[in-house]
């Protein structure tokens, strides 16, 4: 797992006003999300979420998650973002995407999908967290 944080002195009050939905279960090609049901890939954010359709922004495993993929997460006031790389960690997160989030003082976690789920669910209890989750390779 990799994590990039908010610079010292730039912390914000992150008590959740609206909770991010918990991930109930995850396995290869299948996720179950509280209040959203079952799907393959999800965008989750404070107050809700939806299926993550890679074709909307032209996402592919390489070059990976782009700033356009995370814009919606920030629109929902996320101060922490969890990016899953898939079960086999084939989904890349280029430096430009991390930089895009860091410039906006967003804490970023990048991890394999099952680990990303644990990080996200823990954070959902205490902060305005969002995430992109890919449940296959």
Describe each model-derived feature in a short phrase.
Residues 2-57:
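N-terminal, charge-rich interaction modules
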């Amino acid at each position: 797992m990799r994590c990039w944080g908010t610079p010292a002195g730039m912390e914000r009050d992150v008590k959740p006003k609206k909770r991010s939905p918990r991930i109930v279960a995850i396995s290869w090609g299948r996720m179950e999300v509280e209040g959203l049901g079952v799907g393959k890939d999800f965008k989750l954010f404070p107050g809700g979420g939806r299926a993550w359709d890679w074709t909307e922004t032209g996402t592919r495993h390489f070059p990976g998650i782009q700033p356009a993929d995370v814009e919606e997460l920030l629109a929902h006031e996320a101060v922490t973002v969890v990016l899953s790389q898939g079960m086999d960690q084939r989904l890349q997160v280029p430096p430009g995407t991390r930089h895009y989030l860091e410039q906006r003082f967003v804490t970023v976690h990048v991890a394999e999908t099952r680990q990303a789920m644990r990080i996200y669910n823990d954070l959902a209890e205490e902060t305005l967290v969002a995430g992109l989750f890919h449940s296959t390779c």
